[in-house]
Structures are given as C-alpha cells and as structure tokens.
C-alpha cells in the first residue's frame, strides 16, 4: 500500500498540472 501512495500522488500532481 505504501508503494502505491507515491503513484497516486504523482497521478494527482499530473492531473493538477494538466488543469
């Protein structure tokens, strides 16, 4: 689960940057 957190943060960051 801890290994999935950075991936989720990276995805959210990418979405925020795209907006």
From Swiss-Prot:
GO terms for cellular component: extracellular region. The keyword Secreted applies. Expressed by the skin glands. Signal peptide: none annotated. GO terms for biological process: defense response. The modification Leucine amide is found at residue 19. It is found in: Secreted. Its main location: secreted. Keywords: Amidation, Amphibian defense peptide, Antimicrobial, Secreted. Belongs to the frog skin active peptide (FSAP) family. Phylloseptin subfamily. Has antimicrobial activity. This is Phylloseptin-J4. It comes from Phasmahyla jandaia (Jandaia leaf frog).
């Amino acid at each position: 689960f801890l290994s999935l957190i950075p991936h989720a943060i990276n995805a959210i960051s990418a979405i925020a940057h795209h907006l």
